[in-house]
Amino acid sequence: KYISWTVDSPMLTMYHDSVYNPCNYIFIFDKFNYMQFKAMELNHVYYLPLAVDSERLEHLLENTKPDEKEKFSSDISFVGGLYDKNSYDDIYESLPPYLRGYFDSAFRAQLDIFGDNIFDRILTPDILAELSECVDFRQDENSFSDIKLIFTNTFLGYKMAQTERIECLNLLAKAAKVDLYTDDPAKDRLRNVIIRGTVSYFNDMPKVFAASKINMNFTIRNIRSGIPLRVWDVLGAGGFLLTNFQPEFLSFFENGKDIVFYDSLSDMQ
């Protein structure tokens, strides 16, 4: 048997005939994506939310030195990428002007919509036909992905994440001190955000979460309903979390008690 547990959604490599091999047992954390694969009649696909080793984190944090706590203390912190290099920006100049405006408007509209993804509806057959002239879409002969799936997630999804994260960080920095831990700073578009560089996932990141008054999570819109790993990372370190709304939160958390989630940018502020 081969057992896998996804941490990204959707995993585009799963859209391949090999997922039907009887030796594959696949666990998916995003229930929306799990239901999609279940509808494809996969025998060994299961829904399993992500998790964190809280005992490891407890031991790590118990041994954190005072100077480390001071080093990683923040009013508001965000640990994550800004997707400053993404596939959408790579093709932007090759898009017709009206398509640029079309997608720019879609990004602005999606910014304040949570729990729904409008990209599914805006990629009409005519738009997809136009995009096929601009995007070098190639795939393995055993793959069953299509240009809509690829463009929604690889192009629009990561560009949306960039747009949203920069917008949110700049809004927060108007009212409070914001520390950003990233190797992907997009310095020219950030305003009054303090860039702190990278932190190691296993050793230093939990210390940031424990020492921050508010930890931010911005779920990439490709994850339709599931709870991203970053949420579990913060909670496992005992950190306070402010996050965008995800439908599956309602099955695990109480808003205002376990976590605090927002459903609009004004609500976040």
What is each of the regions a protein language model found here?
Residues 25-34, 42-57, 73-84:
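Donor nucleotide-sugar binding/catalytic pocket of nucleotide-sugar-dependent glycosyltransferases
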Residues 9-12, 53, 268:
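Short acidic loop-to-helix transition motifs that present clustered carboxylates
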Residues 3-16:
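A short, histidine- and acid-enriched strand-loop-helix "catalytic/donor-clamping" loop
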Residues 4, 28, 217:
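Redox-cofactor binding/interface segments in oxidoreductases and associated redox assembly factors
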